[in-house]
Amino acid sequence: MLLLLAVASSLSAQNWLTSFDEAKATARQENKKLIMVFQGSDWCAPCMKLERKIWNSDRFKAYAKQHFVMLKLDFPRKKANALPEAQQQQNEQLAEEYNKHGFFPLVVVLDSEGQLLGETGYKQVSPDEYIEIINSL
C-alpha cells in the first residue's frame, strides 16, 4: 500500500528544477519549452495562488510533464527559507536579465533553444486556460 502511494505521488509530482543550466539543457534535449517562474514563495500572495491553483493542479502537472521544463526561481524573504548562496546569485542574475522590473510572480517562456517567447503572470483562470496562455506565447 505504501509503495503504491509513493508511486502515485511521484507520478503526479511537478518536476521543478532550480538550476538554469540544467533546465536549459533538458529543454534542448527534450525539445520542450522552458518555463521560468520568478516567485516569492513566503511573501507574494499571487505567487502562492499561482502555485496552489495552477502549478499544483493535476491537469497542469500532467500537461507540463509532457510539454514543459519547469524552473523555479524563488526569492524568499524569511530567513528560515533562505536559499544557498549560489542559488541566490543565479536567481538574481536571471532576474537582471529576464525580470528587470521585479514583477512577482513572473512566468517567462523560452523555446527549447533559449529564445524568449513571452511572459505572463498570475491570472484567475483554470489550469486549461493557463496552459492556453502559455502556449499562445
Which role fits each region the language model picked out?
Residues 44-47, 107:
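The canonical Cys-X-X-Cys-His
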Residues 17-34, 64:
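A short beta-strand-turn-helix
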Residues 96-97, 101-137:
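Non-catalytic, surface beta->alpha helical segment in thiol-disulfide oxidoreductase systems
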Residues 16-17, 60-89:
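Thiol-based oxidoreductase modules, predominantly thioredoxin-like and allied folds used
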Residues 47-65:
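Typically the conserved alpha-helix immediately C-terminal to a functionally engaged Cys/Sec
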Residues 41-44, 54, 75-79, 102, ...:
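Solvent-exposed loop/turn segments at secondary-structure junctions
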Residues 30-44, 70:
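Short active-site neighborhood of thiol/selenol oxidoreductases, capturing the structured segment around
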Residues 1-15:
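Bacterial Sec-dependent N-terminal signal peptides
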